[in-house]
Amino acid sequence: MWPQPHLPTHPHLPTHPHLPTHPMMSKETRQSKLAEAKEQLTDHHPQTNPSVGTAASDTKKKKINNGTNPETTTSGGCHSPEDEQKASHQHQEALRRELEAQVHTIRILTCQKTELQMALYYSQHAVKQLEGEARDLISRLHDSWKFAGELEQALSAVATQKKKADRYIEELTKERDALSLELYRNTITDEELKEKNAKLQEKLQLVESEKSEIQLNVKELKRKLERAKLLLPQQQLQAEADHLGKELQSVSAKLQAQVEENELWNRLNQQQEEKMWRQEEKIQEWEEKIQEQEEKIREQEEKIREQEEKMRRQEEMMWEKEEKMRRQEEMMWEKEEKMRRLEEMMWEKEEKIRELEEKMHEQEKIREQEEKRQEEEKIREQEKRQEQEAKMWRQEEKIREQEEKIREQEKKMWRQEEKIHEQEKIREEEKRQEQEEMWRQEEKIREQEEIWRQKEKMHEQEKIRKQEEKVWRQEEKMHDQEEKIREQEEKMWRQEEKIREQEEKIREQEEKIREQEEKIREQEEMMQEQEEKMGEQEEKMQEQEKMRRQEEKIREQEEKIREQKEKIREQEEKIWEQEEKIREQEEMMQEQEEKMWEQEEKMCEQEEKMQEQEEKMRRQEEKMWEQEVRLRQQEEKMQEHQEHLEAAI
């Protein structure tokens, strides 16, 4: 509720109090109210003229000319009682008119006082609003400090976790390097994959260079925005303080003008009315300026909200990056587990190979024992076949020495068998039958070898298909990565366009700020002129006690404004400190982003090494398969030799 000041009542005017006009009231409402008040006064006083000074001058002329008027004087210069009554009646009427004019002026002055009081009330209300806004700013600053502390704690925790992860990754890299050295000795790298990797690395380097340039542009734009942020709040506070001072000075100027009007009211009524109109126009201009300032404040609040939203988005981006890092770490763990499993498979295969080798040695020993027994039996049973046994011994020694030259040994066996046919013509038929059986067995062996070769070809084809499928998958992954990179580039282009728009807006704001500064300078010059006038008026105001009270109130208000300015300065200092802290936090965030980039590069290198190791493991597995096939072939050949020997015996 607005306060209702006490006004003096008039018997002819309505008794309701004059409600104050709101500072946002339009010109038409005030003009209409003033016109109604004037009409009421003229209706109740029809005898008064528009100018009171003329009526007073007429009465003086009548007083002077009373002695010279032939109608009112006698021939002897004596006044009749009727003339004296008329003169006294006229004199009373003139006095009444003067009193009514003075009452009218007093009422106008009281109305002006009420308006001035209401203006002071509104200024005090605005000061209270500013105090509330300052408190809100302080609370926001406290909240921002708390949020900054939480961010620092989170950043420290993330830094410790990253250090641990880096140490663990370094240990893993050392182990992997050792394994890679061992694998390089046993494997041969593919040239086509190297060329593809080189091309992809070149593409990645180009993309990273473009990203670094974009980041530098973004940083420069952020710095510009921070500078604009630093300039805007200071200018707002100064502008508000200047406006309050100007309002107070305008109020004091109005009061002094009213005092001067009271001293010269009887002579300058018309000038006072003109001044009232001018003052009303000035008030309306002030109201318009206040509206413009409120709109500017709203725009600045919207900008601050947008900046807060940007900060929140940046925090969300940081959270997303941390989640990506966690996912990458999980992928690294999975790859390490795969490597361990592959190593275990390799150990198992090596153990199997060792077991097979041991079995081969045992079989060789058994064969040697059997051959020795056969030789002993041959010596006991057949003394005549000593020459043949010696030849068989030679053949067995050759088989032991050269396992790979089994075919040559078979030819020698044929030659030896032919010699045996020449020596033993009696057993030709039996030997022919044995030869036919040997031919059949050899055909069977050849068929088995062909079957084994077909199986090997099938295995190789399956491996080739698997490799082709893996290559297709890798190519699909590469296509997906290229599409993602293109999407990121499009996003970066969009961000650059937005940043350019923001720069244009900032330039427009800077131009507006410069215009405001020029206006403020002009207003300060006007204020200096007004202060000089106020010095002259204060000497006159010392005579009036009422005006002194008003001056004391104004001084109290000025002290409050000074206190508010000091508080605002303190708030500005706090804001500067907070901005410095925010800058430090942003620098920390930039350093963390650089570390994240380095870690991503390391992860890419590790993934490439893992791929190379997997290829080497695949090659080793293929070699193991080939070795197993060879061992099987050797075992079959050894069995065939044993059968030949048994048949020959």
From Swiss-Prot:
Polar residues bias: start-end ranges: 47-57, 65-77
Composition bias type Basic and acidic residues, residue spans: 25-46, 80-94
Coiled coil region boundaries: 151-644
Location of the region described as Disordered in the Swiss-Prot/TrEMBL record: 1-94, 300-330, 358-440, 455-572, 584-620
Keywords: Coiled coil
Low complexity bias (residue ranges): 10-23
Superkingdom of this protein's organism: Eukaryota
Family: Belongs to the GOLGA6 family.
Name of the protein in question: Golgin subfamily A member 6-like protein 26
